[in-house]
Amino acid sequence: MNLNLKKWYSTGTPWIWLTAGAVAISIVMVLGLLVLLTVRGMNHFWPKDVMQAHYAPPNAQQEITITQVIGEFVESENIIAQQIISSGIPVDESQPEYRRELLKLGNRDLTGADFSWVLTDFISDVEYPANLVVLERREWGNFYGYLQSVSEAGTVVAEVNIDEVQDDSAWDEFTARLERALALHDEIYKIENQDIGEINYRVERLRLQQRRLELDGRATADALADIAAQRQDLETEYEVLQVSLIDLYEQVNRDTATFIAANAQEKVIELADVVRAYRPNQMGLGAKLLGYGAKLGEF
């Protein structure tokens, strides 16, 4: 028996099975990680519906101020009454627990806060308007609001007709100009991060080449003149790219859009600052899957 076992070990078969098992476990772990990322990403990247509601909690003076909230539901939890009272909201202590919801309100440049807890008992008039817009911006995070108008160099070129619920002309104008701005931004990115980077790399190569000639004692007048000529050509290319950048920035900063956020706050947003715009409350499953895939791909 021991002889057979030793012979089996000597063939290397156990190590083959051990290696195969380790590879199988690694594959399962990788697949599990991908599934975990997909599930977690579903919550982060999925285009969620955006609600609009009125929120009217009492204050310490028993006064009620009604505010409008617009945002995405994130999570909810139960909280004891005493904790709510200690935060300055007088609630009925005879009710042991209250439900509260965490909303992503965005509009950080207007309110200073991206998220806020609200007590479910004081929320009313919840609705999901079809024309609510979500903007993903390069700065300040998400913006939530209603499109009012689109302007070119300060002149309004499209405006929402409040009497026509199904009128999407302003939205179509906005999305067309946003696509233009995104294309221009891609050109700017290419020049700044690729073309100019390539020039800087070549300039550095010339500097090292000149230094090598000097160390080797081969820095003749002709060699230095050749390097200087190449450096001048690169400077000319750089100046041409700078002129192109100035023109592209003027073009990309041309268009703006005016939005109305919660509580009738007006906000003018440059289309150059927008990465993506969509109206989630009127998106079907297919459109949301495409949006999810695009965001996941960027990640």
Feature map (PLM): residue ranges:
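Membrane-topology segments of multi-pass transport proteins
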Residues: 1-20, 27-32, 39-299
